[in-house]
């Protein structure tokens, strides 16, 4: 059986990965052909994607060290922007952060960090 080449979308010049799932399914060389800068975020208190099987597995599989961020006191759903009152009423599990975690303040910091990462990673004239 012929060996297939990894699929690649050359338009993607950098990526931000947040709360990466399924990292444990990667083969040791599963991400060896990733050649773009990566920013990788993990919530330290994520009980749905516990450390080290998910984001850490992705981090270790990347050929180049990513800009790796671990958010203290954050849970699984804290990467979702603050919920509206209506959504909070029907989906409190995804809208309520850990005690003492300020989701709105975190998203201000998160947004700045993501924009700064793309500013560093994407060079003029690199468009698809």
What do these predicted regions represent?
Residues 34, 40-42:
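Short beta-strand/loop motif that positions the catalytic acidic residue
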Residues 1-9, 22-24:
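Serine-dependent carboxylesterase/thioesterase catalytic core
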Residues 22-24, 45-49, 76-77:
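Acidic catalytic loop of the alpha/beta-hydrolase fold
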Residues 29-30, 36, 50-60, 83:
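Short alpha-helix in the alpha/beta-hydrolase fold that links the catalytic acid
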Residues 74, 84-128:
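Catalytic active-site module of serine/aspartate enzymes centered on a nucleophile-bearing elbow/loop
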Residues 18-19, 41, 71-72:
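Alpha/beta-hydrolase-fold catalytic nucleophile elbow
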Residues 11, 53, 57, 109, ...:
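Extracytoplasmic/secreted proteins, especially bacterial periplasmic and envelope-associated proteins
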Residues 10-20:
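A conserved short beta-strand
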């Amino acid at each position: 059986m012929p060996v297939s080449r990894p699929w690649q979308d050359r338009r993607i010049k950098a990526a931000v990965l947040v709360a990466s799932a399924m990292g444990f399914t990667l083969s040791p060389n599963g991400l060896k052909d990733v050649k773009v800068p990566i920013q990788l975020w993990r919530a330290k208190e994520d009980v749905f994607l516990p450390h080290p099987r998910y984001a850490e597995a992705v981090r270790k599989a990347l050929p180049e060290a990513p800009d790796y961020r671990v958010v203290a006191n954050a849970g699984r759903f804290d990467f979702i922007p603050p919920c509206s009152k209506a959504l909070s009423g029907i989906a409190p599990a995804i809208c309520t952060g850990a005690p003492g975690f300020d989701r709105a303040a975190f998203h201000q910091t998160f947004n700045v960090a993501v924009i700064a990462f793309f500013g560093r990673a994407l060079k003029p004239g690199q468009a698809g």
